[in-house]
Amino acid sequence: MPMMKLKYALLLSRIPMLALGQGDYEIVDPNLFYPREPVTPYSQPSPNATGMGGWDVAVARARRFVAELTIEEKVSICTGNGFPANPSIPHHTCQGNISPIERVNFTGLCYTDSDTGIGNSHSYGTGFPAGVTAASTWNRELIRARGYAISTEFKAKGVHAVLGPVLALARVPGGGTNFEGFGADPFLTGAAGYETILGHQGAGVQAEAKQYLGYDGQQYNRTYYSSNIDDKTLHEVEIWPYAEAVRAGVACVMTSYPYVNNSQASQNAYLLNDVLKTHLGFQGYTQTDWFGLKSGVSAILAGLDQDMPGVAFSQTDNNSAWSYYGANYTAAVKNGTVPEWRLTDAATRIMTPYFWLGQDRNYPSVSLEDDPRRSITNAQRQRHRMVAREVAAAGMVLLKNTPGKKGLPLVKPTAIALFGPAAGQNPYGPNQYGLGPSADPANFELPLGYGPTPLTIGIGQGTLAVGGGSGSTFYPRLEDPISAIQQRANQDLTLVDWSTTTNLTMASFVARRATACLPVVASFSGEGVDRNLSLLHNGDDLVATVANNCDNTIPIVQSVGPVNLEAWIDHPNVTAVIWANLGGQELGPALVDVLYGAVNPSGRLVYTIARNDSDYAQPHIMTTPQPYPQLNYTESISVDYRGFERNGKDPRYWFGHGLSYSNFTYSDLVVKTHAGLSESLKQPIQYVADAPGGDSRLYDVAIVVEFQLRNEGPWDGTEIPQLYLEMPPEAGNPTKILRGFDNVQIRDGERQNVRLFLTRKDISYWDVVGQTWVVADGTFTVLIGASSNDIRLKGTLII
């Protein structure tokens, strides 16, 4: 496979076969792994869209439209017409394209990354915080607002579908694309995905839930490994977020690269036909990840509706005729191998969201350019910058604090000093994170570092606003911590100094002269790039050096995921720690908001931070080629915090942890069943989908939980109460599981009543024998806490 231009190969493309380690580049021969065409049996024909759940009008319109098309035209709707590198597509436009059909006034479809803003082009759009940051707000309203703002800009640029949100769980902490998703828990991921989809589609843009299924973030061999998942885990953990996406009315579900139980995801009939289209009642369409298709007829019959980008990765001339779909699809229909009704339904499903969202009426023309001098439409809005800043601030997690004369919030400090490359701007520009001194891969290293020594040079110049790959975006502006803090410090006549090198002697010198020291450290990964759990540029040494010379050291961690903090977290001079996640273009002002108390921190971790890397249930990622690599989900449903609890491991910071400048107390818990249930809770029901998301009875409110929250001060603030559930032994769930949360704003000294609801599905387990959701007999324990380990209230209910 030839290397592409570097910015696509490392930052912005979908790389199916890139293995990176210790600064090396290795293109893996696919023939080392799976045969090219494993045949997947399918259990039933792909079901037609029915129009249930309010989709009936759109489905009817799509059917009338498709009825006018020829076989070739229907196939063209199901087959992308090339990757942006295609020289016939000027100035690098959409990541995926469906050709127009002029005779029926269809102008085509445009698909583009990313879920942090308009990606892969200098398109004058806002650079939003990453998915992991949005989830860290635990704020449904704000998550939806982010999705709406992103897609408002997509629509202004004429894009029909945003390639997100990512609903894959951060199962492996070092997985390269974990930052694109919403963390390690299926319930939280489902809730964040639900709100994001409502935001995107509320703006009139199609959302795509990805990557379905068995994609745990790790990049090495990602197109060839098999994720082997037992049935209980499949339904209770992996599929859970996608059920929420379907319930939100998601337009498209994108399949993943890996195999699932040794059946390639894009031709896995059980996942596509049985689970998604039948049991969940999905009315939209399925689509491959880019270059993710490995078969034609098998995938079509298994329920795969659309191939993207419609050409083979190896076809540098983007010959659209070379595709598993395209002309081969047409031939398969005409010779009877594929029934035409299957093609008709696929095209109907693709067109249904187009009509459902009104994209056939006065939709803007595509205005995406790789050259900013050619851009026609500036999609930025001041209110979008405000949303980006609010999400970035609300997504920052205060891990540690010793309030008073030291720690946070800052109160007119005499002298502030910032340290490390991540504190300032990248000398090569805000959109060149990773390019280093030249565009030659030999000139810089990657943060994979599987050996014991963290990498100290190379990529990672400047402040880290987002991870790499197709989940990133270009920034029209990027305000770093130094610039933002200088502006705020000027109000107090505070001296501001900095050292953005990795020189520890200089850091020592600068630290001794400051009353508040802020080392800014980072951990980077991206599509095609996994990582270890160490900080870039010997960040541990930087923090320790600063702390040895400054008695008020406040590290700021910009990270794509968990890192090991043990080298310095207990240092007596480390008075506070801000986990900044990935803040997007407004990260600097958002950081100032939290540091100075304009925003009382309310972010919570969406994964657990371990004391030892080996304490994670799945600590390792593949680093060497293996024949037929198998990833066995041996932890079963015990993901993240559940695994730590089950295995008796005490992490540094538990899932859901986060401090505030205020103190909150919990009281007066009441747990009761809901009077409006449609049927007895104990009755195992054979559920049949009657709405997108599955049988509507699953979403009956079963239990109502009420309690009191009081803000003891001294600040107005926001608390994130979390509801965990322990089920009876029959359910087979060995630990508590997240089943609810809220984002409660309370003034200093005030009290507020909080009410949370548990649905029938929330309190059910997946019966692998009966193949249905069942409510166990016995005692349910409801736990209300400030994190997965900080439980404040406990109640029980016998069912």
Predicted stretch roles:
Residues M1-Q22:
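Fungal secretory targeting signals
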Residues D790-I799:
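Short beta-strand elements
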